[in-house]
Design a protein with these regions (language model features):
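Charged, low-complexity terminal tails
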Residues: 1-112
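Active-site phosphate-binding and catalytic loops of NTP-dependent enzymes
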Residues: 2-4, 24-35, 78-87, 104-112, ...
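Phosphate-interacting basic helix/loop segments used at nucleotide- and nucleic-acid interfaces
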Residues: 26-28, 32-51, 81-103, 143-149, ...
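Conserved glycine-centered short motifs in functionally critical loops
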Residues: 53-55, 63, 102-125, 182, ...
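A short alpha->loop->secondary-structure connector
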Residues: 74-76, 111-119, 141, 240-248
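Loop/turn-to-beta-strand initiation segments
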Residues: 91-95, 197-198, 249, 293, ...
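Charged, low-complexity intrinsically disordered tails
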Residues: 131-266, 273, 390-481
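Metal-dependent catalytic core segments for phosphate chemistry
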Residues: 237-267, 271-276, 280-319
Length: 481
């Protein structure tokens, strides 16, 4: 059973896609952070860098947008039948762009001039003549039928589209309704863009809740449960426009417990941020995201079944492959991903593990590419990350360790304190009183290991060294005055 749960509060909105009680996808949005992916801006070319084949575009945000020159097409009139072609832009020129990737770290948002307007059943591309279908529609007859229906609707030849997965099984009337809605939207966008000067926000895409409903609420979802009356009404109004037949599947949560708690989802959400992911067999994954790549290590842990080493490795890796695909979706991990499976001698076992991983990734909405599996069980893959990582919305860099995950040891800090004491006394030989403020644990270690040496310094430099305890001080925070 597949459900969508929506938790809407003043401070944040959350959406969870749950399959048979297991959290499969999780989204969060706050007033302080709203995604800009899908937004359309009228921007101004700020600079062009031929060496990287890109332009930086001023769109009115903190960071300038990044636009590959290969992503530039000739602007066209609203719904006009004119030839679409690539051309060069000049500094200071205005351009209509859409955000396709969130600003991450020091990088600005990724932009394109290939505008895509997502409806219920298709994505309209008014400045592009590309036409295609979702790769998840696999039946050839259905693919042919859908393309035929769009031909009957007779879209202008220069207007592109992509038929979405949810269009599977839909009739001409439903598709035509979507086309009319998107054409009307594009006319509004074009008109607004013509009346405004850059930089300007021209169109703001739906918030995270309505995006999830638009992209994931289909006949396979048995229920959409919402815990807010206001949000319930808003979603109903949205569905009346996009898909009335799904209104019967929406439900207002009236339980005593909070929705995510009652559905046993809150604890699963907390586990998204953990480094270790434990599997039912007793094996576990270690997930290490870094600035440049993500490393996932598979460990046998307390694997309970009695197999020989080869079959044990195969069984653990098969279980891990499916869970890894789920974790990539849940955490929205992207970039280069290296998966270190347990070594397997047999080639057929390696192929089967890779097959399970690929099958488990089929429902992933993000673009991905799997390079293969080596004889050492290492899989290299890439996965597109469009939004900011879930973790970055809920956590910030630890001010104590400054994001390292480690602090200097007491032994290291003791050496530092003694060196600083000696340096201070050498530079100020007439100083008769030295005050040292430091962490209590560090002081205990310092006196336990070096009390005699400190007394030696006092005698040699004819001074008094006093210590002040600072219970809230960082272990690396030492003051000598």
């Amino acid at each position: 059973m597949k459900e969508i749960l929506v938790n809407a509060e003043m401070q944040e909105k959350r959406a969870a896609i749950v399959k048979d009680g297991v959290l499969d996808e999780y989204y969060i949005e706050r007033p302080s952070y709203k995604t800009i992916v899908g937004n359309i801006y009228k921007g101004r070319i700020d600079s062009i860098v031929p060496s990287i084949g890109a332009a930086f575009v001023e769109i009115g945000l903190e960071k300038k947008g990044f636009l590959y020159l290969s992503d530039i097409v000739e602007p066209i009139e609203p719904i006009a039948q004119v030839e679409t072609k690539k051309r060069e832009f000049k500094k200071g020129e205005e351009v209509l762009v859409q955000v396709v990737k969130e600003s991450i770290s020091t990088k600005g948002p990724r932009l394109t001039t290939h505008i895509g307007l997502a409806g219920r059943y298709l994505v309209l591309m008014p400045q592009d003549d590309h036409r295609g279908l979702s790769r998840r529609i696999e039946d050839r007859q259905e693919r042919s039928r859908l393309l035929g229906l769009l031909e009957e609707i007779k879209l202008p030849t220069d207007i592109g589209y992509i038929i979405r997965t949810v269009a599977e099984g839909k009739d001409k009337r439903q598709l035509h309704h979507d086309v009319l809605f998107l054409f009307k939207l594009w006319r509004r966008i074009s008109s607004f863009a013509q009346r405004n000067t850059a930089p300007a926000l021209i169109y703001e895409d739906y918030d995270i809740v309505l995006r999830v409903i638009r992209d994931s609420f289909d006949d396979e979802v048995s229920k959409l449960i919402v815990d807010s009356k206001e949000e319930f009404k808003r979603i109903c109004n949205f569905l009346k426009v996009f898909s009335r037949d799904l209104l019967k599947n929406i439900e207002l949560h009236r339980g005593r417990l909070e929705l995510f708690t009652e559905k046993s989802i809150e604890k699963q959400v907390d586990k998204i941020y953990e480094r270790n992911v434990y599997l039912k067999s007793g094996a576990y994954l270690v997930i290490e995201p870094t600035e440049g790549l993500v490393v996932i290590d598979v460990n046998s842990g307390r694997f309970r079944k009695k197999y020989d080493p080869e079959h044990m490795a195969f069984a653990v890796n098969c279980e891990a492959a499916g869970e890894i695909a789920r974790q990539l979706r849940l955490r929205d991990l992207g970039g280069i991903i290296v998966i270190d499976f347990i070594d397997m001698e047999r080639e057929d076992h390696r192929r089967e593990v890779l097959k399970i991983l690929k099958n488990s990734l089929k429902d992933d909405k993000a673009k991905y590419e799997i390079i293969g599996i080596s004889k050492f069980g290492v899989v290299e893959m890439t996965r597109e990350r469009v939004y900011r990582a879930i973790e970055s919305l809920s956590y910030e860099t630890c001010p104590y360790c400054r994001g390292r995950g480690k602090v200097k040891s007491s032994a290291t800090m003791c050496v530092f304190v003694l060196k600083e004491l000696k340096r201070t006394l050498t530079e100020h030989p007439d100083k008769r009183d030295i005050q040292v403020s430091l962490n209590p644990n560090l002081l205990n270690y310092l006196l336990k290991e070096n009390e005699e040496y400190i007394k030696t310094l006092e005698r040699r430099y004819r001074t008094k060294i006093s210590f002040t305890l600072e219970p809230n001080a960082h272990i690396e925070e030492v003051k000598i005055i």
